[in-house]
Amino acid sequence: MTTFSSSTFDDAVMREVRIEASPEVIFGFFTDPEKMIKWKGTEAMLDPRPGGVYRVNVTGREVARGEYLEITPYTRIVFSWGWEEGPITPGSTTVEVRLIPDGSGTLVQLRHAGLSGEGLDAHVAGWEHFLPRLAVAAAGGDPGVDPWTMGPPPDGQ
């Protein structure tokens, strides 16, 4: 069973989801380009090591870019985040993902900090859209075609 919880603070989005998959499997969905595009993006270039750069075409029109800041295999990933075009520039915000074993699954805790105003609202919507897709893909399912790749992206991104 997949369960979700969420909260928003002054400058951060916090989401928690329990996924029926091991931390090792879920880690791969953040570090392997072929796995990433199953839940987020149309193409991805990832160099998952501290100082390594990533570039993900998230919607077919909007490209996220940043740098991996910390990698602890199967436990924690921290990376900078921003958009190649738009008010939230690459490196201006930070995403932290924690993978915590939980019985036969994993508790995924995500914190995206450094956001404000419309950018905060847009990223709340973004993570609410993408984390359920991650849950399906990591558990071995098919989240289907991402509707965000077929139309205009949400405002503020």
Q: Where is each model-derived feature located?
A:
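Conserved catalytic core of Hanks-type protein kinase domains
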Residues: F29-F30, I71
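Short beta-edge strand/loop motif at the mouth of beta-sheet-based domains
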Residues: M14-R15, A21, V25, D32-E67, ...
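Active-site oxyanion-binding pockets that recognize sulfate/phosphate
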Residues: F9, E16, G117-L120
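Short, flexible helix/strand-to-coil boundary loops that buttress conserved ligand/catalytic motifs
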Residues: F30, K40, W81, A138
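Hydrophobic-ligand binding "helix-grip"
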Residues: I37, A44-L46, P50, T59-L107, ...
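A conserved amphipathic terminal alpha-helix motif
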Residues: G114-Q157
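Short acidic N-proximal helix/loop "leader" segments that mark the beginning
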Residues: M1-M14
